Amino acid sequence: VISHHFETPWTEHAFLEPECAVAFYDEDGDVFIYSTDQSAHQTLHECSLVLGTDKVKVQNALVGGGFGGKEDMTVQHLAALLTYVTKKPVKVKLTRAESLLVHPKRHPFYMDMTMGCDEHGNIMGVKATVFSDTGAYASLGGPVLERACTHAAGPYHYENFEIEGTAYYTNNPPAGAFRGFGVTQTCFATETLLNMMADKVGITPWEIRYRNAIRPGEVLPNGQIVDESTGLIETLEAVKEDYEAALAEGKPVGIGCAMKNAGVGVGIPDTGRVKLIVED
């Protein structure tokens, strides 16, 4: 059994194109917003609330890089409000320094994890407590934490997994969406713990992953049944020779495995209801 504490920091998205919005009144008398954000429908909703009218239109234009960093509203409401008040076209664009200050970053995580294995390196169970700093505003702190916990067990086959996650409001800068969506942080902790366990058991990091790798038809610790498209075993086998050769040459080589969701489903129960009326 091995226990360890892990911490990960804020991370900047570093997209090339800073946030920008252009607003004006169109021929229908609506406030029309060209926006470089990743969430046009949310921008429409929030700008409508700001202006107190549903006569608002939003169109994405020249978004450029985002990586999750442009999912939150930054300048769109400012351009819209100024147009609403002045009746003139308005453009609001952040400088690089302003962009770095304003948009949410990757969540800092604080994680305590315990992993147990048998003498052969087969994972018997993992228990974890995870805290994330979502800053002064929630942003996507809830969904990020949900993903972080759902995938923290890794792409491995074992049954005993317990994790508790909490996102906290703090007086720090807001944190939100970023590529990996929380999985990056917990994956780092799980994979590091697995390396520590391999060293304790006396096998290579490759071997402990191969012994525990999920295979089609097996059930992940989060309850998901793995389908035939899963190729973790084949992937590990494909890199084995090069990995071992690099180790033999004393090269600083590492290995890690991870899984991440595609889509937005989180296994919410799919319930149905029917109403029966009995008539004489």
List each model region and its residues.
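Structural alpha/beta core scaffold segments of enzyme domains
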Residues: 1-280
